[in-house]
Amino acid sequence: MARTFILWLHGLGDSGPANEPIQTQFKSSELSNASWLFPSAPFNPVTCNNGAVMRSWFDVPELPFKVGSPIDESSVLEAVKNVHAIIDQEIAEGTNPENVFICGLSQGGALTLASVLLYPKTLGGGAVLSGWVPFTSSIISQFPEEAKKTPILWSHGTDDRMVLFEAGQAALPFLKEAGVTCEFKAYPGLGHSISNKELKYIESWIKRRLKGSSSTCLQLNCLKEMFH
C-alpha cells in the first residue's frame, strides 16, 4: 500500500505537541493511517518581539507582517535545510515524494512555502495557512524545475491582523512569476487562526493528490524535535 506523510509546521511561539489535535480533524479513510509529524521549532531570540526568546523557525524582523515588511532570507534558508532533512529521511524510507505533504500556519506557512519551492523533487503539495512569502523575487532563479510542479494551496482569513490578508495575496504574483500553480482561498471574517472549514478543505485537497493506493501505511507515533 502507498505511504502518505504529512508534516505540520507550527507558528511563532507555538509548539508541535500543541498542534497535534489537528490530526484528529482528518477523518477520511484514505488518511486514516497517514504518518504525521509535528516538530517543534528551536528556542531563538526574535527581533519582532524585542529579542525575546521563543520557539521560532527563523527570525521575524516585523509583525504584523504586511506587504513590504522586511525579511531575513538567510535565517529562512537555514530553517529550510532542516525541513529538507526530514523530507529526505521520509523518502529514503520508501514514501513516494508525491505523497509527501507539508502544511504550516503563519511562520510555519512561510517555512512550508520556502521548503517546497527549494526542494529538488516534486512533492504532493504545500498548504500555507495565513502565511507570507519569506523571499524576494531574486530567489526565483534558484527554484528547481521539479519543485515548481508542486501545487500550493494558500488559505488566508480576510480579517487577519497579524499577517495581513494583502500580504497573503502578494504570494499570487510571486508564484505566477515563478511558474508555480497556486490555489488561493479567502476565508471571510477569519482572523489569524485556523477554522474547521479550512482543515476540511485541506483534507480533501490532499486526498485528491494522493498517488497509488487510496490507503496508506506506516504510522509514526513518536514526536521528533527538530534543530536540537
Curated annotation (Swiss-Prot):
Q: One GO molecular function term?
A: short-chain carboxylesterase activity
Enumerate the active-site residues.
Answer: S106 (charge relay system), D160 (charge relay system), H192 (charge relay system)
Under Enzyme Commission nomenclature, its number is 3.1.1.-
Do you know which SUPFAM superfamilies this protein is assigned to?
Answer: alpha/beta-Hydrolases
PANTHER family named among the record's database cross-references: CARBOXYLESTERASE SOBER1 (PTHR10655:SF62), LYSOPHOSPHOLIPASE-RELATED (PTHR10655)
Q: Which family does this protein fall into?
A: Belongs to the AB hydrolase superfamily. AB hydrolase 2 family.
What is the official name of this protein in its record? Carboxylesterase SOBER1
